[in-house]
Amino acid sequence: MLLLWPLLFLQVSALRRTLFDRPKQLMQEGRVRLVGVIPSSGRVEVYHDGQWGTVCDDGWDLAEAQVVCRQLGFPGAVSVATGGQYGEGSGRVWLDDMNCKGSESLLSECSFKGWGVSDCTHKEDAGVICAPGKNTTSIRQMSVDNSLGLSDDLGLLFDSEDGCDFTIAVRDLSEEAELTFCVHRVILMIYPELNLTHDTRNITVDISQTCHTHVPRFLRYLYTRQIDVSTTSAQCLHQLAFIFGVQKLMEDVGRVFTALIPEDNTFQTQVSMYEYGVRTGDLVLQENVLQYLSWNCEFLISSPVWSTVSFDMMDALLQRSDLIVKDEAVLLEALERWIQDKGDQISSDKQVSLLNHIRFLLIPVDKLYDIQFSSSALRQSNEKLYLTGLLRGFQFNALPFSKIRDQVVKLSGNYIPRIYIGDEWSLGLNVSTVNNPHYNPYQYGYDQRYGQSNRIEKYLSTPAHPSAVYRGQMIQWQAQVFRSVQDCRNSGISCNSVPLVRFLATSSQYSYSSTIRYNNRLVLTCKNQNNVFHVQDFKNNMAVIPTNSSMGLPNPCPDDYSFRFVVRPQYI
């Protein structure tokens, strides 16, 4: 994939598998139901992949409730219910981080992470209260749905070309290759991006010859809305969907791209993917790549690919708070090196724009002191900006937040921490050490002890906040990994799945609760590949490690990864 991504397209044959083998599943796919005492309110459940599952209440609001209630035939929604108010469901948490406009016909048409991609438990199952009224799903009516057969019939219509009245020519000018297809104009009229007029009888599509073998399957999708997508066919299908303006297929194929993201440790594939996402306007693909590169920024900035990153990509990266680096000073040094490598390609205005994304307030105070005497070309050409950043950084470190609150808030997100993994603010746990009898529990300089079997514990002391005001005020943190249900029980914890991790302060955290909050993070990294593939927050000091199928990115090292616990203090 590394070499072929810049070429954009692959000549492959995809595995064909008909979804009609499971008619019962397809007939119910995406349906919702309410589980409660009365028909108009209850826990929301959605049907997918042959089973009912729940919806997480993260992002759950009235717009999402309106879609559910209308899908069930009620006039609208009265209110939402969160926190498992209607009891805890069972099975998978199918949907998380829902984002509906409120006008969708089906809940599954809204934006969400992906089927089964969630870090929620059933304690966060969402519910709704619908307005009572006419319910079109009442037993007084009978719904007849033969849409499954319609899709099959339309597929046969495409195959036969009976009555076709529209010609699509597919060509590659560089190879002088061309294919011709006869289709039905009425089908193409469904896709307004083609801008067909009443007199249009043919169109020509220019695309690489390596994609020509996928064109028939794509055109058949326009009839049936069904297609099998593999990692090797995804690029061509995505490009065709972009040309024809089939946004839904672009988003679905983008999820296949997500599976490719962790496969290249050189980052060349990811950078090419992002630029492709920009060209095709695929915001989902852009976000997935940026998230992965943010998580792996520590490795990215030390790779040869760093100097090839575009200005737009750099600008997008530097604005993110999920960016993982040792500290903010390391990021500034990497930016200075990138600008130096780019030379005259980066104008002075662009330099200023990028430097404004550096969070000088969060640079460790000892490194702020060193930056004063830096002789870098970027520093010399942007002296005023550096001095302003240094002044604000020293003020942030020397003064109580109550004194500088109004000024700091004006700086937007510049006082919000990224994920800083320096030794002062994070600790690592290697899961393989649990079963290693030769492991020295003091090798990192922390007190560590083992539970009866698979539990491992480790301690970290940090200042209450990075500001110099709090340097002498320490908080001790305890990190625990429970690898069996029995270990959870031994510690008085209920866990439905393992591994389960806990990260909590054992002293004095709450004395700062009116000034500081802790948005701590758990980072999972492949030990041998230097590959961060999952980041999540803690809920009530706990984090359930999701299965591979429910992660936003696939786990490339399911049996060989390490945990890193990161403390992230932030002024309130």
Curated annotation (Swiss-Prot):
| Assigned GO CC terms | extracellular region; membrane
Q: Which Gene3D superfamilies match?
A: 1.25.40.420, Potassium Channel Kv1.1, Chain A (3.30.710.10), SRCR-like domain (3.10.250.10)
> Where can this protein be found?
Secreted; Secreted, Extracellular space, Extracellular matrix
Q: Which InterPro entries match?
A: BACK (IPR011705), BTB-POZ/Galectin-3-binding (IPR051481), BTB/POZ_dom (IPR000210), SKP1/BTB/POZ_sf (IPR011333), SRCR (IPR001190), SRCR-like_dom_sf (IPR036772)
Q: Give the signal peptide as a residue range, or say none if absent.
A: 1-14
Q: Name one Pfam family in it.
A: BACK
Please tell me the species this chain comes from: Danio rerio (Zebrafish)
**Where would I find glycosylation on this chain?**
N135, N195, N202, N430, N548
Query: What does the record give as the function of this protein?
Result: Promotes integrin-mediated cell adhesion.
State which gene encodes it.
lgals3bpb
Q: Which cysteines are joined by disulfide bonds?
A: C56-C120, C69-C130, C100-C110
Main localization (coarse)? secreted
Q: Give me any GO biological process, just one.
A: cell adhesion
- Protein's name in the database: Galectin-3-binding protein B
Q: Which residues form the BACK domain?
A: 270-372
